[in-house]
């Protein structure tokens, strides 16, 4: 008994032997949603740019800070806070020294502020420096200097010293040397950005660059240490910073300490 042949056209359609037919139909249905999504993202970027005093879209800042909380450093936090620091410190930001990794980025951001001169100290060897960073190093604006040793500057060379992600990697033994030296080169004060205890860090990146994981300490630990070192919190700067931050709805993802300079 002969078998009745099936409908080849039906089998062809059911077996999905035309792989692009379904995808083309699906693409035609999803393309309006894709277009709407692109318009929404573009609008967010434009709105963020319009309302950001720093020149970096708020949306992008939010994205970067979220990444920072998931395992990156506080250096981007320091960059984001620069306009707020300018409001809080005013003329005390005429000559600024930044100390910490990726200092070229921070110095470049400081240069965009009116009436601000900036210098930077990179505590670690700079790998794959871009053209801008190489230029800053050639001009002597940025230096590579192990902060366990004295900085190559005279006393009170700068109005303000901003430190990010540099002290988190030092033991108390080296902090005893480094923190007083940072205060030595400042005439008006120090601003320290430090990670919160329990904050996630990119372990592989940390070990390859810094040689050790960060020692993330509590605010109470830092305040006790500042007192032992003879440094006092700058209450006036703290109040002005908090007021400026509130106006911009700025909520830092790192600890920020404002210290008075030695007198």
Each model region followed by its residue ranges:
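Class I SAM-dependent methyltransferase Rossmann-like catalytic core
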Residues: 3, 9, 13-95
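Class I SAM-dependent methyltransferase SAM/SAH-binding core
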Residues: 91-150
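A short acidic, Gly/Pro-enriched loop at the edge of an enzyme's catalytic core
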Residues: 148-161
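A short SAM/SAH-binding and catalytic strip from SAM-dependent methyltransferases
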Residues: 159-173
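Hydrophobic adenine-recognition pocket in adenosine-nucleotide-binding enzymes
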Residues: 166, 182, 195
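Conserved beta-strand signature within the Rossmann-like core of class I S-adenosyl-L-methionine
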Residues: 186-200
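Short alpha-helix
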Residues: 206, 211-237, 255
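Core SAM-dependent methyltransferase catalytic element
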Residues: 238-263
């Amino acid at each position: 008994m002969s078998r009745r042949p099936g409908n080849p056209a039906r089998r062809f359609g059911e077996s999905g032997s035309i792989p692009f037919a379904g995808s083309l139909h699906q693409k035609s249905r999803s393309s309006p949603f894709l277009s709407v999504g692109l318009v929404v993202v573009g609008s967010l970027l434009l709105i963020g740019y319009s309302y950001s005093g720093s020149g970096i879209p708020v949306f992008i800042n939010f994205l970067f800070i979220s990444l920072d909380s998931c395992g990156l450093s506080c250096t981007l936090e320091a960059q984001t806070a620069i306009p707020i620091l300018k409001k809080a410190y005013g003329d005390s930001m005429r000559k600024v020294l930044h100390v910490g990794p990726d200092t070229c980025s921070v110095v470049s951001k400081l240069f965009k502020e009116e009436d601000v001169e900036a210098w930077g100290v990179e505590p670690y060897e700079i790998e794959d420096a871009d053209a801008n960073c190489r230029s800053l190093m050639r001009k002597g604006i940025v230096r590579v200097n192990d902060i366990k040793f004295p900085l190559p500057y005279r006393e009170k060379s700068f109005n303000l010293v901003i430190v990010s992600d540099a002290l988190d990697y030092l033991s108390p033994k080296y902090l005893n040397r480094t923190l007083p030296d940072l205060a030595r080169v400042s005439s008006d004060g120090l601003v320290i950005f430090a990670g919160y205890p329990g904050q996630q860090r990119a372990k592989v990146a940390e070990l390859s660059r810094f040689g050790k994981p960060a020692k993330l300490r509590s605010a109470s630990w830092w305040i006790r240490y500042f007192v032992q070192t003879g440094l006092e919190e700058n209450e006036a700067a703290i109040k002005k910073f908090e007021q400026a931050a509130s106006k911009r709805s700025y909520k830092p993802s790192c600890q920020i300490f404002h210290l008075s300079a030695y007198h």
